[in-house]
Amino acid sequence: MMPPVRGTLTQGRSLADLTWLRVGGPADWLFQPADEADLVQFLGALDPAVPVFPMGVGSNLIVRDGGLRAVVIRLGRGFNAIRIEGDRVIAGAAALDAHVARHAADAGRDLTFLRTIPGSIGGAVRMNAGCYGSYVADHLIEVRAVTREGRPVTLPAAELGLAYRQSALPEGCVLTEATFRAEAGDPAALARRMDEQIARRDSSQPTKERSAGSTFRNPAGFSSTGRADDTHELKAWKLIDEAGLRGARRGGAQMSEMHSNFLINAGGATAADLEGLGEEVIKRVFQSSGIRLEWEIMRVGELPVNKE
C-alpha cells in the first residue's frame, strides 16, 4: 500500500518519455508531489524498505530497459520557483538551470555558467555540474532537502561532499531548493556572455540530437569546456577519437560525429544499445591508451527479463 498523496502517484509508469534519450522501462511507482509538505508526508509514511529514486528532467540518465524497482520521485511546478535576495539566488530543485541563469542575469547576478548546463537545479547540485571553469560548488551556500525518512533539513554546502561530477548526498534524500551566492554584473553584459556560450556550444555539440550531455568524465577531472582544460591533454573526446570511435554505432546508439564524447539515440535505440556502446568505448579506449574512462551519465534500473 502506498501512502495517500495530494500530488500524482502512478503505478507502472514508463520513464522513457521522461528522459532525454527516450529509453527505459517503467518505474514501480512514479510520485510527483504537489509541494514540500506532500513530499514530507509521503516519505514519512512510506515503508522504509521501499527504495526511492529522485529524478530530475532525465538529462543525464539512462534508465535500463527492465525499468526501476523503486518509487521514482519527480518534482514539478511546486518546486520551480526562483527568487533573488541581495547577492543570493534561491531556486527550487525543479527549476531548469538555464532559467535560473537567465533570471539571475536579469537581476544583475552572475550564474551564467548554468546557462548551457542541461537539466534542473537538483541534478546540477547532485552532480556538482560545471561549465566554462565554474562549478556548483563555487557558488552554492546551502540546500533544502527531505530525507528518506520524511524529515525536512537544511544542509550547508560544506556537508555535501561536492567534488568533480559528484556529491555525497544521503541515499534517498530529495533536494527541494538550493541557495547560491552570485556576483553582481551588468544584465546586458551577462546576457551577451550567455549568448556567446550558447553559440559556442551549438557549434561544437550535437544539441539537435537526443543525447544526455557528456558521456564520460575527463580523466584528469577537468570540465570539458572549462578554462583549466583548454590546455590539458587528457580529454575524453580525444581518447575516443584516438581509438577510432567517433561515429561508432550499436543498434540505434551512436557516438556523435560532431562531438565524440556525446552518446546519442540516432533512432530506435534501446537502453541496452546505449549502455552497450558506452561499455565498448570504455573497453577499446583502455586497449588503445591504457586509460579507463568513467561514465558521467548515470545508469539505473534492471535489465529486461529474457522471455525465451
Swiss-Prot record:
**Annotated EC:** 1.3.1.98
- Biased composition of type Polar residues is found at 212-226
Region annotation (Disordered) maps to: 197-228
Entry superkingdom: Bacteria
* Principal cellular location given in the protein's record: cytoplasm
PANTHER family named in the record: UDP-N-ACETYLENOLPYRUVOYLGLUCOSAMINE REDUCTASE (PTHR21071:SF4)
Into which family does the record put it?
Belongs to the MurB family.
Q: What does this protein do?
A: Cell wall formation.
This chain belongs to the protein called UDP-N-acetylenolpyruvoylglucosamine reductase
Which species is listed as the source? Cereibacter sphaeroides (strain ATCC 17023 / DSM 158 / JCM 6121 / CCUG 31486 / LMG 2827 / NBRC 12203 / NCIMB 8253 / ATH 2.4.1.)
